Amino acid sequence: MKYDYLVVGSGLYGAIFAHEANKRGKKVLVIDKRPNIAGNIYTEEVEGINVHKYGAHIFHTNNKEVWQYITQFAEFNRFTNSPVANYKGELYSLPFNMYTFNKMWGVVTPEEAAAKIEEQRQEIKGEPKNLEEQAISLVGRDIYEKLIKGYTEKQWGRPCTELPSFIIKRLPVRLTFDNNYFNALYQGIPMGGYTKMVENMLKGIEVRLNTDYLENKEELDSLADKVVYTGPIDAYFNYKLGTLEYRSVRFETEVLDKPNFQGNAAVNYTDAETPWTRIIEHKWFEFGTQPKTVISREYSSEWKLGDEPYYPVNDEKNGALYAEYKKLGDAETKVIFGGRLGEYKYYDMDAVIAAALAKVKEVFE
């Protein structure tokens, strides 16, 4: 059986490419080494709740074309991301807004809040030398100490004084009472979970799970004229130029015999002492009324080969190494490299969709 396209990985990029190729009459085989489809947006039903197995995914975009495209596969609810920060039992609104400043300093007007931030920013003179100085120069010491420092150090596994200032280009400060984290026109969660959405994309397409492409590369390559590869690009080339680095995340998920644990989908723990970075309570993504609840504690961790890769470490060294791998990739005429791992890129979901659609256009039009 000969296929036009072998698509390696059933995450957003792979699923969209497969859907569009199939729609154009191409014969497509999708494979995934996991026992399930949907890549990192996979949701699993537990106690009637759609659990985001690989971390919280909240869809948001300003791109109308992307929104119109994705909503043909699922109806989206009106979920708005409004995280809460817990600093040693003190609760603050994220993003930083008037609720945050009122709680922090007792200020009531935007003018008072702006004056307080301006006063605290003066501590840093000249060019910020590291992330700590950068953050203080943007929002002042109080907000930095309580809401940025501990969280960031847990995330990156090193002190803020050793992290480069460019990691935090800007910190959104809102002198309003708006709790909506994303400034996006369109936002929500697919009702019934992301897995169902990806299932709809892959309707009528052959999918083989528990199939590791790199372990059976020759045999699988012989099945198709072209390959769309969405795995790690360095793994494709057997790491021959070296290993690209990632940050990883570990989740501890549990079912609780109560209807409400924290009253919000996401609570960030911004002190250094709490080992987890945040707790996700999954039912609130879909305004759940189930009698039980499912929570996931999220821990940032150093990544080593074999761990699940989450966030590319986009520093100079890794960027230069990726550029070398990209040259090798460009020389593979039979293979399209795409997605977060194939392009070693921190992609929001809407950007992955846009990239996949752009590639479809390039290939088929």
Predicted segments with their positions:
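Mid-domain catalytic core of redox enzymes
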Residues: 24, 214-328
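Glycine-rich FAD pyrophosphate-binding loop
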Residues: 19-47
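Active-site/ligand-binding neighborhood in enzyme catalytic cores
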Residues: 85-93, 98-226, 230, 234-237
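N-terminal Rossmann-like FAD-binding beta1-loop-alpha1 element of flavoenzymes
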Residues: 3-30, 360, 364
